[in-house]
Amino acid sequence: MMTATEIRQSFLDFFREKQHTVVPSASLMPQSPGLLFTNAGMNQFVPYFLGVWTPPWTPARATDTQKCIRAGGKHNDLEDVGYDSYHHTFFEMLGNWSFGDYFKREAIRWAWELVVERWGFPAERLYATVYAPDKSKGDPGEFDREAWDFWAELFRSRGLDPDVHIVHGNVKDNFWMMGETGPCGPCSELHVDLTPEGNTKGSLVNKDSDQCIEIWNLVFIQYNAESDGSMRNLPACHVDTGMGFERACSIMQCTNGFKDFSRKPSNYATDVFRPLFDRLEVLSGRKYADVYPAPGSKRVDAEDGTLQEAIAFRVIADHLRTLSFSIADGILPGNNGRNYVLRRILRRAVRYGRRLGFTQPFLAELVDTLVESFGQVFPELAARATTVKEVLNREEASFNETLDRGLELFDAETASAGKVSGEFAFKLYDTYGFPIDLTALLAEERGLDIDMERFNRLMEEQRERARAARKSEVVRALDLKTDAVTEFTGYDVDECAATVLEVSRQGDSLFIITDKTPFYAEMGGQVSDAGLIEIGGESYHVMAVQQIGNARAHVVEARPGLEVKPGDRVHLSIDAERRRRIEAHHTATHLLHCALHQVVSPDAAQQGSFVSEDRLRFDFNSSAVSPDQLRLIEEKVNGWIEESLPVHCTERAYADVKGNAAIAQFFGDKYGDVVRVVQVGGCRDGLDGVSMEFCGGTHIANTKNIGLFKIKSEGAIASGVRRIEAMTGDAALEMIRQHVVAKSLEIAKAVEKIKEVNYELADMGLEQVPVPTIEGKPGLTALGASDIRTVNDSLARFDASVEHFKQTALDAEKKLKKARAGQSAAKADALLNEWLSDAPSSLIQVAEGAGELLQELLNGLKKRQYAGAAFLLCVDSSSLLLGAYCGKDAIADGLSAGDMIREVAALAGGKGGGRADQARGSAPQDADPQALAAAARNIING
């Protein structure tokens, strides 16, 4: 019986023998912006099918095993994982591909050869489907007679009746389309009868039966769907096939090499998952049993511990694969889009981990086992295993606290309820980060329903608020479409003449597309150029530039008198000074990326960037960056700037450089046959620079033109994602100047506070606090220094001086407070000695003083164990403060200090309160102290 590793390798070796090039799996970060994750083997090959790229292989054939995720979006298997034997969020798709080379005969013949002749599938258990359109329903294309004939020949060779073993399929199951228009064609699927008898004669094909499983889908791309609904034959036909790896392993291993069909195959009962289960058994002390709920049931008896634990084993193993491969490809758990899907998956795994007794992070303990099984096939997993563990530990630890709190709230909320309200489900999501599917899981475990209609309504209201908050005045060419092509000349020139190709109006803006332009469009994190467009002798400001397909639209205000039409000649000129500042920040971003790899970690992968004329922003995955690391990063970047390194921008054949680990390439990015390499330092054609990246942006010619590089801030923007903001040149100097000005204001405030304190200390006859002197305030020489160490040392001395001023001011205030307290204590002691000299049973007094005196008076009464009731008023220039005290005798008589304060303060429109023995309050400054004292006397005397 073949192992999973042997099955995968056998597939790839078979097609290598058929002159296919074995290509690596694409990243799980998809090329298409419409996809959350790479979800099919064909994703990375779409540009070849569309004719955008030329296949680099001779012959034009490829084979691979592709990492895929189906969770979130249109294809979402998340909720089914664990409850049956075949759903996964992560899976491998084995495939072979032909780009205008071979077609149906070879694809079908080779599929049969591999499955039947090499792997030994019983031919009598196989059923092929071919496309048979229902013309009465307007189905596209024609009956796939070619595929039928090829399959028939193979079945007959084994003495089998083609009319039994070839099943006609409808447009839903057997016709593939890339979109409403574009490449498309019929499919032919291969199904396996897994019933014990194996004689269903095709009756279970496409009937959603787990006893007749599709193992391979062959797609024949031969048409182009036109906008009028017609089908045009393509000049070159393609083959796109996909075989579920886990499914193939299940069929071969669970039947013991096709010898025993007595039990239903399960993807989880294979050596794809067994190593993870073994490790989980060790960690949890529980045993995995390959048992499942009744078909179609999502309700699991809470008393059935074995089944509960089996589901948990499967969920954790599946989700661990999804999380680990995604993180290795640079996709991290987060709060938006695919990142939030990953966070949901992780939190679901953690919740199921509780069923196995895990209350502390445990997922990272499974990573080494996963690497042992898959690290050779997917080397990126092994290379980034440490990062994967760090991210899992961090996310899991964070969510465990949330989960504990959420479970408490859920149990309290649902203790006496028969349903989970939409408001509560939304609160768990919005306040505590509970994904709705996790709340649904908790409800399911307790047999409760959720008011999803109300939850969805609250979610939509939140989205509406978010959309309203995001509205801006920035013009976007969202609704424009064009087939025009604009040549970008901005790498070489700052201005050029051009011909208008198209003009569109949206609101108060004109979108002018020209045949060429020096204007860079907003993309790749770089802002668009600004400048002027001269039309008919008049110049107009270009507000923005948008990329629309292969064209660039210049956004201009539609002013009265502005007339422009296709064919007009115009002159375009960018704001060159602004462009140079943008270029400086862009090149500095590349240097920052390089420095991060050297100082922090080679796994500090880019998660996003923004480059403008006055700042740069760079997001990357990492744990916290220390101050020492930040200083070293600054020194490295400024060191490269001081070296006056040339910046080379060259075009290269992608095939020549795609494997060069020294060139930064980004997960999920797809490149054409020719790529632009931006190299800082080294020889122009040597690929030996200190920094090398694929980049289509604009850059300076030499690092000396960057000027000073200074980091403004570094911090977390999401779990595991950090952000550095930095500035270069004049923008950096202005940032430092503003910092010095702001800190100087802090010094001025501190000095003013020290002087105020000293005035009072002088009045008290006490020693005053010395005012420090400013040391290290950066002058123009320091601010203009190119040596970042000089700048940072000067700033550090100045910042330390600022902190010294602020601390001196705090110490001065403490000294004054202590002095006041000492005076107040002495005064209070003297007053109480006077007031209590004849041992009165009650005490009502008015004194001049502030809050310190009132508190010392109350403290003194307590210290003297005064047994009666007291009401005290302290009056100064800015306040009227009230205090009440009740000793043991007064309390025994039913008096309460808190009640007394509340009642008396209310008479004057004030407020207050406290305990029965001691309370404080205040009244408006214009209140009559004697009237309040009289009111208190009435309360005390009853």
From Swiss-Prot:
Gene Ontology terms for molecular function: alanine-tRNA ligase activity; aminoacyl-tRNA deacylase activity; ATP binding; tRNA binding; zinc ion binding
Keyword set includes Membrane: no
EC number per UniProt: 6.1.1.7
Catalysed conversion reaction: tRNA(Ala) + L-alanine + ATP = L-alanyl-tRNA(Ala) + AMP + diphosphate
Compartments where found: Cytoplasm
Keywords: Aminoacyl-tRNA synthetase, ATP-binding, Cytoplasm, Ligase, Metal-binding, Nucleotide-binding, Protein biosynthesis, RNA-binding, tRNA-binding, Zinc
Source superkingdom: Bacteria
Keyword Amino-acid biosynthesis carried by entry: no
Cofactor: Zn(2+)
Pfam families: tRNA-synt_2c (PF01411), tRNA_SAD (PF07973)
Any one GO cellular component localisation term in the record: cytoplasm
Residues involved in Zn(2+) binding: 586, 590, 695, 699
CDD domains listed in its UniProt record: AlaRS_core
InterPro entries: aa-tRNA-synth_II/BPL/LPL, Ala-tRNA-lgiase_IIc, Ala-tRNA-ligase_IIc_anticod-bd, Ala-tRNA-synth_IIc_core, Ala-tRNA-synth_IIc_N, Ala-tRNA_ligase, Ala_tRNA_ligase_euk/bac, Thr/Ala-tRNA-synth_IIc_edit
SMART domains linked to this entry: tRNA_SAD
Manner of cofactor binding, per the entry note: Binds 1 zinc ion per subunit.
GO biological process, alphabetically ordered: alanyl-tRNA aminoacylation
Main location: cytoplasm
Function: Catalyzes the attachment of alanine to tRNA(Ala) in a two-step reaction: alanine is first activated by ATP to form Ala-AMP and then transferred to the acceptor end of tRNA(Ala). Also edits incorrectly charged Ser-tRNA(Ala) and Gly-tRNA(Ala) via its editing domain.
Entry's free-text remark on domains: Consists of three domains; the N-terminal catalytic domain, the editing domain and the C-terminal C-Ala domain. The editing domain removes incorrectly charged amino acids, while the C-Ala domain, along with tRNA(Ala), serves as a bridge to cooperatively bring together the editing and aminoacylation centers thus stimulating deacylation of misacylated tRNAs.
UniProt similarity note: Belongs to the class-II aminoacyl-tRNA synthetase family.
PANTHER family: ALANINE--TRNA LIGASE, CYTOPLASMIC, ALANYL-TRNA SYNTHETASE
Protein name: Alanine--tRNA ligase
